[in-house]
Amino acid sequence: MKIKVIHGPNLNMLGIREVNLYGPMKLEDINKNMEAFAKQNGFEIEFYQSNHEGDIVDAIQESLNENVDGIIINPAALTHYSVAIRDAIKAVNLPTIEIHMTNTAAREEFRHKSLISDIVAGTITGFGPFSYHLGLIAMIQILNEIKMAKEAQAKAQAQANKQ
């Protein structure tokens, strides 16, 4: 199974910008850690980062043609105003987890509202780079449960066909 991780604006600057908020870990290191954990659990993982809303919308939509089973997304600042990203997530109808490294509820008022939190499977905030790891654990669990449900349904259908 395949998971796509989408990083929004300014996340390419991790380890450089606002280290007091986001810590010293670079995006490449977060991706390497996630890749290792995904492989240990038998999952394929791919990463995408853009500072542009339309490109992120394209990346979400392209998930359907790439046989992606689930999306982990940190929309960053776009969380708070991108109806386009919200609509793209709804359109692809894939299990999606929203990630934020900082606790957005403890930050500026404008960061308190997420336009996607009500349409995703869950939201993980405030654990720094570990937020991504927690999101990956959650996504693996969700996808394994979906797989088991499909297998059980297929088994039940096969038994029903025998009768």
From Swiss-Prot:
InterPro entries: DHquinase_II (IPR001874), DHquinase_II_CS (IPR018509), DHquinase_II_sf (IPR036441). Keywords: Amino-acid biosynthesis, Aromatic amino acid biosynthesis, Lyase. It comes from the Bacteria. Its EC number is 4.2.1.10. The record marks 17 as: Transition state stabilizer. The keyword Amino-acid biosynthesis applies. Substrate binds at residues 74, 80, 87, 101-102, 111. It is an enzyme of class 4 (lyase). Homododecamer. This is 3-dehydroquinate dehydratase. Pathway: Metabolic intermediate biosynthesis; chorismate biosynthesis; chorismate from D-erythrose 4-phosphate and phosphoenolpyruvate: step 3/7. GO terms for biological process: amino acid biosynthetic process; aromatic amino acid family biosynthetic process; chorismate biosynthetic process; quinate catabolic process. It holds the Pfam family DHquinase_II. GO terms for molecular function: 3-dehydroquinate dehydratase activity. It catalyses: 3-dehydroquinate = 3-dehydroshikimate + H2O. Catalyzes a trans-dehydration via an enolate intermediate. Belongs to the type-II 3-dehydroquinase family. The keyword Lyase applies. HAMAP family: AroQ. It comes from Nautilia profundicola (strain ATCC BAA-1463 / DSM 18972 / AmH). The active site is at residues 22, 100.
